[in-house]
A protein has these predicted regions:
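Short helix-to-turn junction characteristic of helix-turn-helix DNA-binding domains
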Residues: 29-33, 72
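The N-cap/first-turn positions of alpha helices
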Residues: 21-25
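Histidine kinase transmitter module recognition
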Residues: 17-18, 60
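Recognition helix of helix-turn-helix DNA-binding domains
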Residues: 32-67
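A cross-family signal for key residues in well-ordered alpha-helices
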Residues: 27, 40, 70
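Linker/hinge segments immediately adjacent to helix-turn-helix/homeobox DNA-binding domains
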Residues: 1-17, 36, 40
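Alpha-helix N-cap/N′ positions at the starts of helices
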Residues: 7, 20, 48-51
Length: 74
C-alpha cells in the first residue's frame, strides 16, 4: 500500500542517509515513472535525476532500478 511504502521509504531514507530530494526520486521510481517523467514532475533536469539515481544506488549498494524497487517493497 502507499502508506506502507511511505513509512518504509522514510525508514530507508534515514538508514541510508538519503537527502529529501533523493527520497523524492526513490519514491517516484517505485511508482514506475521514467527518469524523464521524474525530472518533469520534480522540475529538475534529466541529468540531475540521473545524478540522484547514481547516489541512491550507491547508498543502497544496488546496480539497477529493479533492485532498488525490490528493496523498497521489502
Amino acid at each position: 500500500s502507499k502508506k506502507k511504502l511511505e513509512k518504509h521509504v522514510k525508514y530507508l531514507m534515514q538508514e541510508a542517509g538519503l537527502t529529501s530530494r533523493e527520497a523524492d526520486v526513490a519514491r517516484l521510481i517505485c511508482t514506475g515513472l521514467s527518469d524523464k517523467e521524474i525530472a518533469k514532475k520534480l522540475e529538475l533536469s534529466h541529468h540531475t535525476v540521473k545524478d540522484h539515481l547514481k547516489k541512491i544506488y550507491a547508498k543502497f549498494r544496488v546496480h539497477a532500478r529493479a533492485q532498488l524497487v525490490s528493496l523498497m517493497y521489502k
